[in-house]
Curated annotation (Swiss-Prot):
InterPro entries found in the cross-reference section: CysJ-like_FAD-binding (IPR003097), FAD-bd_FR_type (IPR017927), Flavdoxin-like (IPR001094), Flavodoxin/NO_synth (IPR008254), Flavoprot_Pyr_Nucl_cyt_Rdtase (IPR001709), Flavoprotein-like_sf (IPR029039), FNR_nucleotide-bd (IPR039261), NADPH_Cyt_P450_Rdtase_alpha (IPR023173)
Entry note: cofactor: Binds 1 FAD per subunit. Binds 1 FMN per subunit.
CDD domains: SiR
Domain Flavodoxin-like: 73-212
The name this protein goes by in its record: NADPH oxidoreductase A
EC number: 1.6.-.-
Residues involved in FAD binding: 249-299
Organism from which the protein derives: Dictyostelium discoideum
Length: 631
């Protein structure tokens, strides 16, 4: 099974694998600053006891009814990177602000055990599709539950909003599955399933408006008195969660930082302590890093806004809890722009807000032109503009627009965690977790720009500094259970990271299955990541290492060439029950390796191409052929 990943346009990882696709907003960090700096940013609350009481109140308010006699609505979302959650939150807010007599409650599918469907009447489902057409990782137990338990949902009226990406196979598959399952269990669809390609807020808003228009017309629903059953069940569920997780990340100390490469592209190895976090991972998982925006860029933005850095704004309800104490109700403008919002990836709605507030006629005409074809993905001019302009560029370009700061912040995307494949094994070291990261720097509109997370770690963190982390499980990229099973790993360039973890794990546990590793890069003396370690593993007989250096000879050599040179060996590995893993570029490398494998099978197993493709598909279904790839 493959996990296909879209990279944010300005983020390149040497830690291969899981990275962000959409604008995730609910993952949280403790401040990577000292107490004094925390006071400067407004992190440290003057009255911890009062804040603790406020936190308890806030948690209770999640399922406290606004009035005693309302019709409850369940909004159920499944998300991998947060977009479904963001849409679900907006739908919840729209229903609760516009529809009198109705009350929307929002639940992540990972909390499905607290739901009593026999007590629900209207269910609105929002889910993304991950990887090779599978549900989001944390939503999978819910999908399995529905498959194993044929519920009677004949009393429920429902609608599904399916999120996907047309560039991948199995478009919106998870949403289609839930739509079909609810129908088969007797639920009545009051709005046909809507499928949305990527982050198209025009479509999202249209769906929200449609639902808000249809819900009051539904028959057969009744208002409910008394406390909602979810009130107590949600509190019990919260108590069952681990000490640290994506909703309360661990503030980890940087232990080691060293450069892995030479030349113009810099790659670094990082090690973070796990301490008493109780965080656990297995090879194939990713580490999420919650970065800060660069202080210089934040200062420049505040200067353009003509506001004080210490200007107080409301703390976003989704903002992560910083440390053991709850967040204060207000934080500084510096804090919110440093920790909360993505100042590189701007949304179309920001331009609409500026257009509504702009004073200069030329600026207004430019904004009008950009928005002439709407704010959806079909407006290619707008999409291209936003891809090439950060918040600082936009504020400079439309300097006469001065919308209220709260309105401007409301149109910014949330700052995402960055995901890096883990390059270590807990079987070898339980006290730390390792990554390798490419330091991203590039030119845009005459100024040097940097990747948010990579430069946060490379340039702004020293050994001893802290950053917030959590583990992101990747169940579709796992070592075989049988320690004698041979494995084939193809990880050119950035794809090496999880295979370092694989090798360390098999070594520590004494696995006897053969380990074949194919690695490729430009030059052996510039970007051969972990070259000494891999060559030592090879010399010790732990792995069989095959390298391809594309720029060392006049004829470029890639991992595909090395695979072809060892065709019979690869067929023997498949016939022996071996597992195949590919990690790296999804646009060219992974498809080319797939076709190379098909060619090898066709030639050496004496079958035609269709049968070779069918065999590879069978291996995928059996989880003997797994991909962790990204664009």
């Amino acid at each position: 099974m493959k996990s296909v990943i879209l990279k944010p346009k300005n983020l390149v990882l040497l830690g291969a694998g899981v990275t962000t696709t959409y604008y995730l907003y609910k993952f949280f960090s403790a401040p990577s600053v000292s107490k004094d700096e925390g006071d400067k940013f407004g992190f440290n609350a003057p009255d911890p006891a009062a804040l603790a009481r406020a936190a308890v109140k806030e948690k209770k308010e999640r399922f406290v009814k606004p009035s005693d006699n309302v019709c409850p609505i369940l909004i159920l979302y499944g998300t991998e990177y947060g977009l479904s959650a963001e849409v679900a939150k907006k739908l919840e807010e729209s229903i609760n602000s516009k529809l009198e007599g109705f009350w929307a409650r929002i639940i992540d599918m990972e909390e499905y055990e607290i739901i009593e469907f026999e007590k629900e009447q209207i269910v609105l489902i929002i889910t993304s599709t991950y990887g090779d057409g599978v549900p989001p990782t944390t939503a999978r137990p819910f999908f399995d539950y529905l498959e194993a338990n044929r519920l009677n949902l004949s009393h429920i009226q429902f609608s599904v909003l399916a999120l996907g990406d047309r560039s991948y196979p199995h478009y919106c598959a998870a949403g289609k599955t839930l739509d079909k399952q609810f129908e088969e269990m007797g639920a009545k669809r009051f709005r046909d399933r809507i499928e949305v390609d990527q982050e198209d807020w025009t479509c999202f808003d249209r769906y929200i408006d449609t639902v808000c228009g249809l819900v009051p017309t539904l028959g057969g629903v009744e208002k409910r008195e008394g406390q909602d059953y979810l009130y107590e069940k949600a509190k019990l569920f919260a108590l069952s969660q681990g000490k640290y997780n994506k909703k309360k990340p661990y503030s980890s100390k940087l232990l080691v930082k060293r450069v892995l490469t030479k030349g113009d592209k810099v790659g670094i190895h990082l090690e973070f302590e796990l301490g008493d976090s109780e965080l656990k991972y297995v090879p194939g998982d990713a580490l999420a890093i919650l970065p800060d925006n660069a202080a210089s860029e934040v200062s420049a933005i505040i200067s353009l806004l003509k506001l004080s850095p210490s200007f107080k704004v409301s703390t976003p309800g989704w903002h992560y809890q910083e440390g053991e104490q709850p967040n204060p109700s207000q934080i500084t403008l510096t804090h919110i722009l440093t920790k909360c919002f993505d100042i590189h990836n701007c949304k179309p709605e920001l331009l609409q807000l500026l257009k509504d507030n702009v004073k200069n006629q030329q600026e207004k005409e430019k904004l009008t032109n950009l928005l002439a074809q709407g704010t959806g993905k079909s407006n290619t001019q707008l999409v291209e503009f936003l891809e090439n302009h950060h918040l600082i560029d936009i504020l400079k370009m439309f300097s006469s627009a001065r919308p209220p700061i709260d309105d401007l912040l409301a149109q910014l995307a949330k700052l995402l965690p960055r995901y890096y494949s883990i390059a270590s094994s807990m079987s070898e070291n339980k006290l730390a977790v390792s990554l390798c990261v490419a330091v991203v720097k590039y030119d845009l509109h005459g100024s040097e720009r940097v990747g948010i997370a990579s430069t946060h770690m490379a340039d702004r963190m020293n050994v001893g500094d802290r950053v917030s982390i959590f583990i992101n499980n990747n169940p579709d990229f796992r070592l075989p259970e049988d320690p004698t099973t041979p494995i084939l790993m193809v990880g050119p360039g950035t794809g090496i990271a999880p295979f370092v973890s694989f090798i360390q794990e098999r070594k520590a546990l004494g696995h006897t299955g053969e380990n074949h590793l194919y690695f490729g890069c430009r030059r052996s003396d510039e970007d051969f990541l972990y070259s000494k370690e891999l060559q030592q593993y090879h010399n010790d007989g732990l792995i069989k290492l095959y390298t391809a250096f594309s720029r060392e000879t006049s004829q470029k050599v890639y991992v595909q060439n090395r695979l072809l040179e060892n065709s019979q060996q690869i067929c023997d590995l498949i016939n022996a029950g071996g597992h195949i893993y590919i990690c790296g570029d999804a646009k060219s490398m992974a498809p080319q390796v797939h076709e190379t494998l098909s060619l090898i099978i066709t030639k050496h197993m004496s079958i035609d191409e269709a049968d070779a493709q069918a065999l590879l598909h069978k291996l995928e279904k059996e989880k003997r052929y797994q991909k962790d790839v990204w664009f």
